[in-house]
A protein has these predicted regions:
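Helix-to-loop junctions at the C-terminal end of transmembrane segments
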Residues: 49, 148-162, 246
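Helix-loop boundary and gating motifs at the non-cytosolic
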Residues: 94-140
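Loop-to-transmembrane helix entry/capping segments in MFS-fold secondary transporters
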Residues: 14-31, 132-136, 217-227
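A late C-terminal transmembrane helix in Major Facilitator Superfamily
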Residues: 218-249
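C-terminal ends and interior cores of transmembrane alpha-helices
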Residues: 73, 172-184
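Multi-pass alpha-helical transporter architecture, strongest
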Residues: 65-77, 259-282
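A membrane-interface helix-boundary motif in multi-pass transporters
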Residues: 50-63, 133, 241-263
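Intracellular juxtamembrane helix-capping segments at the cytosolic ends
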Residues: 1-14, 122, 202-215
């Protein structure tokens, strides 16, 4: 919802000459915020569970959700886009299935799969080392480089295009995931997680920026919702699969799944570069 609102405001109220730079910075911030949710969140949960009790983390999340979601709903920016384009023609819904948009959704889904498979396999790995409650703390190491590079993505030169950023940092993610599968100590796993974090932030920024650029006319809200849901759905599916694999086939097998997820991200990035270019519709 946040991305949808911000993209609409930028598209409706920013001068065309400033839109690209502003959108890039906005997507960088939003992706860094995602890192806080998907990576730093488990890190904080681990701290609270270890220092106080597990229920404290759940209670804290409930309070934060109530306070800040309510504040977002009532924020004055919500009125800036209401009724502004009531007569704007919407592109047919079938345009959401265009290959150049679908490939972005697949890439974002891959990131969600990576989040879920990494945290679940890491938890199994830490359990074999007798430190299952510390998995969230170790997982948080990915957020260091990820959030920082996500915010710094706005400073990348225009010559380093979004499609190439996706591919380059996706390869970094894949390389780290392959190394993660062979980690044999907690220290090694921590170092590898930090390296993998370097690939996540810029990849998400590139994907969301491409999704915004390729959104059909009048369908930006739907596009942003699909992309956001792809992360969550991917994380949920991968968590369930990785948990079952860990129980049925062992931790080593589960630790291969992040590499599979990262491979999906890279394959989608290659597909994105190979697809014929078209003029952005939104």
């Amino acid at each position: 919802m946040s991305r949808t609102r911000l993209v609409a405001i930028i598209g409706q109220r920013m001068a065309p000459a400033r839109r690209e730079k502003t959108l890039s910075g906005t997507m960088a911030y939003e992706s860094a915020a995602d890192e806080t949710v998907f990576i730093i969140g488990p890190f904080l949960v681990g701290i609270l569970a270890s220092a106080i009790a597990p229920w404290v983390a759940v209670a804290g999340a409930s309070v934060l959700t109530f306070v800040f979601v309510t504040a977002f709903a009532l924020h004055p920016t919500g009125k800036l886009v209401v009724g502004q384009h009531a007569e704007l023609t919407q592109a047919p819904a079938r345009q959401l299935l265009r290959p150049r948009l679908v490939v972005v959704v697949v890439g974002v889904l891959g990131i969600g799969l990576f989040f879920g498979s990494t945290l679940t396999s890491l938890t199994a790995f830490m359990e074999t080392h007798g430190e299952a409650s510390q998995a969230g703390l170790l997982y948080g190491l990915m957020g260091i480089g990820s959030a920082g590079l996500a915010l710094g993505s706005a400073a990348f030169p225009r010559a380093f295009g979004l499609g190439w950023r996706w591919l380059v940092f996706g390869v970094v993610l894949l390389g780290g995931a392959i190394a993660f599968a062979s980690a044999d100590s907690v220290v090694a796993a921590g170092v590898i997680l930090a390296i993998m974090g370097i690939g996540i932030g810029p990849t998400l920024v590139a994907q969301y920026s491409l999704g915004s650029d390729r959104s059909p006319v009048g369908r930006s809200a739907t596009t942003m919702t699909i992309l956001g849901s792809a992360v969550i759905v991917g994380q949920s599916i991968a968590s369930a699969i990785a948990g079952d694999v860990a129980e049925q086939h062992g931790t080593a097998a589960a630790m291969l799944l992040p590499a599979v997820s990262a491979a999906i991200v890279v394959v989608a990035a290659v597909g994105n570069l190979l697809l014929p270019r078209r003029v952005a519709t939104a």
